[in-house]
């Protein structure tokens, strides 16, 4: 790896080797996990290279290939598992300046990978009265390319399912890591080759996404004395086909009172809540539906006189629930779970009863293959890595799937098996394994046994440490 020669080849491009800047841009939100914080704290790249065009990306990748320098792509750096952290050093490819909104048409938008989701949604309504179908809770800073390469769902998934569901990404344009990099257009099922692949098998340079009707969504919070009543309310609302909701998030006490400091005045400490985004035209029906429940509306953004300083409702949900807890109590961490249907509420109750306040519940209602399901992002009052692993094992022993946010590899953070399609595509597009090394176990160690119970340690990371 000849960094000096690479810098000469990149003359005229935006290159930064200031140690503080390089370290800053070599990190994401890995510190959500105490395990990853310890493992990845020392990780840093050698250079930050910031292209403005696809042609510059091609030039950068060709030069890195020539000098054997690894490349790790970065959007806004808001991922949680070290997706954008360069385990083998090398170049961090900062795509933030490829942020143009190139085309807006009925039902679709085309952007560069660095386009920020909130900026896209500011541009699209004036043209077509539409918005993106879904977004993470990091909507304000997150880039679309980063969301496609590292995300899975978010606000809007109650209507539109997961990001990898067919039709939720229309087209991707990517560049390969070869001596002469190729530009590829992926559509249909082919987009799955690079989606949620952390940039291990191609650099995304353009994204085409579907749009849906835009509304001035109303933030609502409903309070409950019992968490399972809150969860049941969320489930019942999710199956109301006539009430348009963009977000249905039950959160157990004492999370709201203890960690949602700006909203704290609306809650009692023992009160669980459901955080919601409701379409304006659905509010009357929603109010009638809520009146049948055991809940009380404790907050309505359209009725609250003083909204100054209050974050939007979505910044209480998804990964922001954990973020707000960590800001108050740095020992907090979290899990990512899926409670199997049709008895998803039964599985939730079993885990709530088993762990109590050690693992306070946080649910997100989403759509799976046309049916309502529950993803969980429960908080964990962290004590030791061994206890964290035990909590994970108990969930799995009780039929709950864990997508482990305390691992930096695709497989361990997913279904604990090789994605043969993504692996085959990497063989085609990155034959030297220079794109985001260490993140795909199937490439680094094809014989790895996922049943071993041991976490995978990338040899390059071990050397760097």
Q: Locations of the language-model features?
A:
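Conserved glycine-rich FAD pyrophosphate-binding loop
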Residues: 69, 74-76, 87-90, 96, ...
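A conserved active-site cap/scaffold subdomain adjacent to cofactor or substrate pockets
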Residues: 256-300
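Helix N-cap motif at beta-to-alpha junctions
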Residues: 226-228, 277-284, 340-342, 380-385
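Glycine-rich, acidic
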Residues: 232-262, 298-315
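N-terminal flexible segment immediately upstream of the FAD-binding catalytic core
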Residues: 1-62, 78-107, 253-264, 309-329, ...
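Short amphipathic alpha-helices in soluble, non-transmembrane regions
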Residues: 6, 64, 233-239, 282-296, ...
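General beta-strand structural signal in soluble alpha/beta enzymes
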Residues: 15-18, 50-51, 71-75, 93-95, ...
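FAD-binding subdomain of flavoenzyme oxidoreductases
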Residues: 102, 117-118, 122-242, 463-465
